[in-house]
């Protein structure tokens, strides 16, 4: 037999198990081919021997599974001469017992029974042998893949685990393996009190050099003991375990920072309540030349309303749509000489400035707090909006002529220039008290010099806290005009309310109340479509819609202020105005037929007890019957167009 290198054949039995005839067994193996069977030894009892190298005899931890140079004794010989009990050193089962056809040097091939599974001495792959009757399942385990346990790396790592576990448990008194595996990487409030109430030393010095710590998985050691200094944060109450900042870049998804909620910070400035058309109007109105390119409009919006600094880019598309589709803006020629489309300027349409200014004031009145919150410099709001009375028309109602206080039929006031149809107003009739103003109670003692400029401003601060007081005392079923306190006059009305019936009877006591304030309700008239779709904001048809609504509010048929019954919805043809005198009752028109007159309280179908006020501000004023014993008061007319109707 050809001798082999020493490193490949160094597996022998330990010293005490080495027998005296072992040297002779080695010498009796004559040289021959590697695949030829070795002759049987004369000493059958010394068959546990194997190849011996020239070096010192020592045992190695494991061998390759397909080594062709190792001779192993038969199971029956090992049973007889190598006891199964504990000895000075464990005996390892050679893989030649399971792989006989790979050139192993064994005894004669005439004894195949040695390789059967029915042997009486199964061996553990790397521990001492066990008997079949004690561990019957050991045979099946060895027959599957015994070589999987014979590599040096896994064996050494596996045998070192109990030592590290014992040391780790000394520093983790209240934690189990499940708590370490499931608790710390994903902290939550659902852990038991044992985990939450323990003081834990996350990185003890002994565990820093361990190889297989925490759940016995060496790759997980970076989750708890990183090479960088730990940055632990403890809660003030001390009732929870620390949450580590992990230094390894391989576990970015496991970083649990307590202030993680502040990373997605809320925007400091909310979205402004102004529509894009109003924001463009503000930018153009506050420009030096009155015209700006699109880029300057963007800069104005981001400077004064920081919301647009972080808003999606879709808001720029909305700005461009408003500029091109809204008639309030027009493209002007760039006088600097640039004729490209990018250099064009945008300016305000002079015919639409009044409408845009009123729209701007309306939004300021609607929610001034929200407007200022969305601005970078809230103190600049008034300067950006500008003077309300700038370039606006004259007040709606002028002062009555001096001769109006004399006796004679009531004449409607002359409308302002540019308004063809007569406007409806509230006029005092000639009464027995020449110096008495019938609206004095309404104005709480303030005697106005011009009815068209002074009105009552219904606000919670000015309105009396008690029940509404009668404005015009009426006798015998006559009607009582009441104003409901506590309802602010500036509150927006529903957007579907028709603006054509907007004969405003109440207004604030300031001459700044202008034509647009009186004619137009405070509700949204459809000029702002941002709530529907930003891409559909302020299209071309809105300019015509505004003009149509404004014309409808001025050019109407005679406004129906009084209807006698639900079945009659229109007034008869104009009749000569009746004249009432204090001694007798006033004759009032009824809906039974044209020209029919009936005394109040006569019991007809058109009695004044059924009268209703059908104006836009029916929410502010209503007519109710009063007891017949009420004292008589001055006569006041509500005059639709040229036909006054006597109420008292």
From Swiss-Prot:
The keyword ATP-binding does not apply. Transcriptional regulator which regulates the development, differentiation, and function of thymic epithelial cells (TECs) both in the prenatal and postnatal thymus. Acts as a master regulator of the TECs lineage development and is required from the onset of differentiation in progenitor TECs in the developing fetus to the final differentiation steps through which TECs mature to acquire their full functionality. Residues 58-67, 462-473 have a biased composition (Pro residues). It comes from the Eukaryota. It comes from Homo sapiens. SMART domains: FH. The keyword rRNA processing does not apply. InterPro entries: FH_FOXN1, Fork_head_dom, FOXN1_4, TF_fork_head_CS_2, WH-like_DNA-bd_sf, WH_DNA-bd_sf. Changing residue 321 to N: In TLIND; uncertain significance. Residues 271-367 bind DNA. Changing residue 325 to P: In TLIND; uncertain significance. Residues 1-105, 392-445, 458-508, 623-648 are annotated as: Disordered. It is found in: Nucleus. Changing residue 242 to S: Does not affect transcriptional activity as shown by a transcriptional reporter assay. Keywords: Developmental protein, Differentiation, Disease variant, DNA-binding, Hypotrichosis, Nucleus, Transcription, Transcription regulation. PROSITE patterns: FORK_HEAD_2, FORK_HEAD_3. Its main location: nucleus. This is Forkhead box protein N1. It is linked to T-cell immunodeficiency, congenital alopecia, and nail dystrophy: A disorder characterized by the association of congenital alopecia, severe T-cell immunodeficiency, and ridging and pitting of all nails. T-cell lymphopenia, infantile, with or without nail dystrophy, autosomal dominant: An autosomal dominant disorder characterized by decreased numbers of T cells, particularly cytotoxic CD8+ T cells, and increased susceptibility to recurrent infections, mainly respiratory viral infections. Additional features may include impaired thymic development, skin abnormalities, such as atopic dermatitis, and nail dystrophy.
